[in-house]
Amino acid sequence: MQLFHLCLIISCTCPTLQASKLCLGWLWGMDIDPYKEFGASVELLSFLPSDFFPSVRDLLDTSAALYREALESPEHCSPHHTALRQAILCWGELMTLATWVGNNLQDPASRDQVVNYVNTNMGLKIRQLLWFHISCLTFGRQTVLEYLVSFGVWIRTPPPYRPPNAPILSTLPETTVVRRRDRGRSPRRRTPSPRRRRSQSPRRRRSQSRESQC
């Protein structure tokens, strides 16, 4: 299996620092956390069960449907776009290598071991990476971080003392938007408009002028 790791590193030619950390560090087993620079951590992602994350195929289809133009652009859009690009490239190289190893292994047991290792270990890490960066681009990084914390608190709370359903990421932005609207309301809306002031009757204007003189 060490030879498999070595082949992965040699074949995964990624030019950026994020990809180097992913291929040379994280998948190799070094103590490098690819989420730290985004305010999260591997431990925080580990609170989400493995069946929470969609398949790699679904995540790749989602990223292509939503961000194909930005991902294919030569320009730097955001750190999340860069990390997403390299995760997709690394997964493609990994699949190419796994296919090559599977075709050249004569022993069926060894072939199944390689396929199972890729799907259960590296596949889960890639699914976590893809989900995290797609979610940050879709809902915002702060919303995703709040969701991870909320889910972590929920899952660690004993069942008798927590809500029956886990938090849902898609509902958090709605709450955030409502709060921002309440905080962002301008006090000018409460004051009467200039039209209403002009439409006041002369009698009312006289009474107001008398009060101002007092």
Curated annotation (Swiss-Prot):
State the GO CC annotations. Answer: extracellular region; host cell; host cell cytoplasm; host cell nucleus; T=4 icosahedral viral capsid
Region annotated Disordered, chain positions:
164-214
| Main localisation | secreted
Can you summarize the PTM annotation of this record? Phosphorylated. Cleaved by host furin.
* Marked site positions, Cleavage: 185-186
Q: Where is this region: HBEAG?
A: 25-27
Where in the cell does this protein reside?
Secreted; Host nucleus
One GO MF term on file is: RNA binding
Q: Which GO terms describe its biological process?
A: microtubule-dependent intracellular transport of viral material towards nucleus; symbiont entry into host cell; viral penetration into host nucleus
Asked if the Swiss-Prot or TrEMBL record annotates the protein with the keyword Disulfide bond, the reply is: yes
Supply the alphabetized keyword list.
Answer: Disulfide bond, Host nucleus, Host-virus interaction, Repeat, Secreted, Signal, Viral immunoevasion
Span of the secretion signal? 1-19
- Record note on quaternary structure: Homodimerizes.
Name of protein = External core antigen
Q: Say which species the protein is native to.
A: Hepatitis B virus genotype A3 (isolate Cameroon/CMR711/1994)
